[in-house]
């Protein structure tokens, strides 16, 4: 059975992800107590169900300590994938404010004044981060701070399309001026490279457009940067595998996340597609949803 566990911070998009999996044919359960999961998996398998998605959050805090062992045990019999959704505190506060929902851990905190509400919400978010932090190492982390709901649904679809039993590498381009990704395992700064932004004809384009590709591809220093990052990854990917890592997020950052980081993330993703399951995501580039997050397929490989 394929089991997808969705966990992370409240307000980061777990309901959106669960709905996307339901649309993909998964049997979905929200806020299932972790200790019930093995029994549910056995029951559904006996009923002929082959796909299960479960959302688990801090409302199950009394059982969260059991999760690492449960994940290991379930992985012996099932294809288990863990998706850990995260977002910045600022983004989470804005979402709770817009939806007027109360954080699930804020019930015992003061809500008497506006300042008290903000303080209580921040405290609840930080408390939840501490509670669910041990689960992050088992899952692929995705920072949804700047991700729209339709983009997250598309990303979840890409996530479940990956092949099993191998390391999944996500190359994520971003702009430093919008903050660093919360989900990065490795981060490379490519701001030292020539910037197409200063060419007025290239400024409105992205690293996916042919004129920008031609500009960067003609520069030896760009290829040196790509070769160095590629060599580092080729050397250390086996060690990540040996450490039983299932997921690795490699963040590539330039100033705005539109030109250089996009081109380099795409190039590295194509190169590494021979070595691992690869997803590429462009966090800040003004591209459509399908281009901003996709699984690198055979046709992308050089």
From Swiss-Prot:
Amino acids binding GTP: 57-60
Function as written in the Swiss-Prot or TrEMBL entry: Displays ATPase and GTPase activities.
The protein, known as: Nucleotide-binding protein Bcep18194_A6125
Family of the protein in this entry: Belongs to the RapZ-like family.
Keyword Metal-binding: no
Domain of life: Bacteria
Keywords from the UniProt entry: ATP-binding, GTP-binding, Nucleotide-binding
GO molecular function, one term: ATP binding
UniProt-annotated binding residues for ATP: 8-15
């Amino acid at each position: 059975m394929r089991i997808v566990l969705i966990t992370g911070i409240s307000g980061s998009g777990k309901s959106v992800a669960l709905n996307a999996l339901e649309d993909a044919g998964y049997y979905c359960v929200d806020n299932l107590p972790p200790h019930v999961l093995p029994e549910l998996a056995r029951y559904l398998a006996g009923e002929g169900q082959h796909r299960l998605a479960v959302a688990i959050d801090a409302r199950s805090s009394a059982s969260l300590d059991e999760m690492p062992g449960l994940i290991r045990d379930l992985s012996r019999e099932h294809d288990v994938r863990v998706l850990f959704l995260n977002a910045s505190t600022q983004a989470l506060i804005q979402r709770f404010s817009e939806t007027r929902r109360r954080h699930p851990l804020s019930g015992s905190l003061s809500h008497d004044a506006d300042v008290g509400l903000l303080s209580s919400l921040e405290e609840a978010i930080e408390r939840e981060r501490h509670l669910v932090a041990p689960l992050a190492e088992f899952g692929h982390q995705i920072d949804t701070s700047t991700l729209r709901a339709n983009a997250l649904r598309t990303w979840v679809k890409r996530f479940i399309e990956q092949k099993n039993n191998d390391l999944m590498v996500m190359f994520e381009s971003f702009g430093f001026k919008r903050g660093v990704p919360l989900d990065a395992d490795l981060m490379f700064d490519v701001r030292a490279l020539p910037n197409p932004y200063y060419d007025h004809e290239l400024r409105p384009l992205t690293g996916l457009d042919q004129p920008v590709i031609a500009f960067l591809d003609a520069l030896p220093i760009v290829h040196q940067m790509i070769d160095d990052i590629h060599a580092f990854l080729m050397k250390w990917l086996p060690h990540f595998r040996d450490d039983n890592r299932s997921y690795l997020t490699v963040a590539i950052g330039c100033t705005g996340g539109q030109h250089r980081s996009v081109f380099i993330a795409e190039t590295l993703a194509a190169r590494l597609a021979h070595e691992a399951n690869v997803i590429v995501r462009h966090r800040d580039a003004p591209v459509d949803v399908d281009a901003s997050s996709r699984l690198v397929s055979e046709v992308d490989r050089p």
